[in-house]
Amino acid sequence: MFRGATMVNLDSKGRLAVPTRYRDLLNEESQGQMVCTIDLHQPCLLLYTLPAWEVIEQKLSRLSSMNPAERRVQRLLLGHASECQMDGAGRLLIAGTLRQHAGLNKEVMLVGQFNKFELWDEQTWYQQVKDDIDAEQSTQEPLSERLQDLSL
């Protein structure tokens, strides 16, 4: 399980150094093999271990290519999926097209989200956090049943 938000730098080749606290787990779970793709709803990238991504691919394969909405999701997620291998120095090369899509420059936020990471441009991340907090504080929507059961 991945959790926490960490600022990492992209080098001039588009590689990010995976924080050391995750390296052993990534090597154990997937021998450092990762898959990166776009997020359909946020200006960030999604980074999965290969085994976690293969579960998603199985789900995507069950969608109908004859249904326009399902085909769009397949096209966007699979069409942007890029395999990346963690090197001996613990770095991952993020494809240029993906970096461009998410507006990633030098400072990137690596955000743990259970079975995946999100990769955000640092400034976009902080703005998103502010927007999310503002939305939570001003919402008049009733809580979903699942949120009502969440005790922190």
Swiss-Prot record:
Assembly and interactions?
Forms oligomers.
Q: Which gene is this protein's source?
A: mraZ
Is-annotated flag, keyword Membrane?
no
Q: Cite the Pfam families for this sequence.
A: MraZ
Domain spans labelled SpoVT-AbrB? 5-52, 81-124
Q: Mind telling me which SUPFAM superfamilies this protein's record contains?
A: AbrB/MazE/MraZ-like
For this chain, the family text in UniProt reads: Belongs to the MraZ family.
GO process terms (BP): negative regulation of DNA-templated transcription initiation
What organism is listed for this UniProt entry? Yersinia enterocolitica serotype O:8 / biotype 1B (strain NCTC 13174 / 8081)
Function, in words: Negatively regulates its own expression and that of the subsequent genes in the proximal part of the division and cell wall (dcw) gene cluster. Acts by binding directly to DNA. May also regulate the expression of genes outside the dcw cluster.
Name of this chain's protein = Transcriptional regulator MraZ
The chain's coiled-coil residues are none
Give Gene Ontology CC terms.
cytoplasm; nucleoid
Q: Which Gene3D superfamilies match?
A: Transcriptional regulator MraZ domain (3.40.1550.20)
User: Which molecular function GO terms apply here?
Assistant: DNA-binding transcription factor activity; transcription cis-regulatory region binding
Q: Where in the cell is it found?
A: Cytoplasm, Nucleoid
Q: Which UniProt keywords apply?
A: Cytoplasm, DNA-binding, Repeat, Repressor, Transcription, Transcription regulation
For this protein's source organism, the top of the classification is: Bacteria, Pseudomonadati, Pseudomonadota, Gammaproteobacteria, Enterobacterales
Signal peptide limits: none
Q: State where it is primarily located.
A: cytoplasm
* Superkingdom classification of source: Bacteria
